[in-house]
């Protein structure tokens, strides 16, 4: 019983985070293929990445209600925080044969931010603490990495943002490092430092900063 398990964790002073994977959802695409990302070459076929996993189209608003409902139900059983992962467009697969039937009138960042706002507003009455997982390179890239994620467009809608700065996910040559895996501390320090700088710039004005 999940509620009982969470109560046990709370009794031991453990802060419990519930992780919800969002747009990568092979189960839901089987039930509602009309909401899924499709193949450009045959728009009746659900697109899959190199691992055989399918995605819901970010712009599929009927799915947004499902995610909000899932968040409400999860929070009601006692989670201290709701963490949303795979809040992005797909990235690994045949990107030349991909079609987003629900997201054709807006850019990827715009579509994703619309979802963020809908999620935030839908869960606001619960008082739930919300967090978002982002690609690590959102800390340094100003573009959307072709997945819709832009750090500044995430900040207004979540209490915490967690860039996944795994050194293994950065390309060779990043920041001058031939192999980022050989510079674990330096990479994390550099990328998270950039994230802090951008967060301060996006959420505060110089006049509002005080130093003690």
Where are these regions (language model features)?
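Glycoside hydrolase catalytic-domain groove-lining segments
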Residues: 102-134, 138-212
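Active-site-proximal loop/turn and secondary-structure-junction residues that shape catalytic pockets
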Residues: 22-24, 86-90, 134-138, 167
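A structural motif
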Residues: 79-80, 158
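Conserved, mostly hydrophobic/aromatic
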Residues: 9, 16, 67, 74, ...
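Active-site-proximal loop/short-helix segments
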Residues: 26, 32-34, 81-109
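Membrane-embedded segments
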Residues: 1-6, 12, 16
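Active-site-adjacent "subsite" loops/lids of carbohydrate-active enzymes
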Residues: 2-7, 23-76
């Amino acid at each position: 019983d999940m509620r009982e398990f969470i109560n046990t964790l709370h009794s031991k002073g453990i802060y419990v985070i519930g992780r919800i994977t969002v747009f990568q959802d092979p189960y839901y695409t089987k039930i509602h293929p009309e909401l899924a990302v499709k193949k450009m070459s045959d728009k009746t076929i659900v697109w899959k990445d190199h691992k055989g996993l399918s995605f819901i189209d970010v712009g599929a608003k009927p799915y947004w209600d499902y995610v909000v409902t899932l968040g409400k139900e999860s929070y009601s059983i006692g989670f201290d925080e709701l963490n949303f992962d795979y809040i992005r467009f797909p990235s690994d697969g045949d990107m030349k044969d991909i079609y987003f039937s629900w997201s054709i009138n807006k850019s990827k960042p715009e579509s994703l931010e619309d979802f963020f706002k809908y999620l935030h507003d839908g869960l606001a009455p619960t008082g739930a603490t919300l967090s978002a997982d982002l690609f690590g390179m959102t800390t340094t890239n100003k573009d959307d990495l072709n997945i819709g994620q832009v750090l500044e467009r995430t900040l207004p809608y979540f209490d915490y943002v967690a860039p996944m700065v795994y050194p293994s996910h950065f390309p060779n040559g990043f920041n001058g490092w031939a192999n980022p895996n050989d510079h674990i501390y330096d990479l994390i320090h550099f990328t998270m430092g950039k994230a802090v700088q951008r967060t301060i710039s996006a959420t505060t004005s110089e006049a509002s900063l005080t130093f003690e």
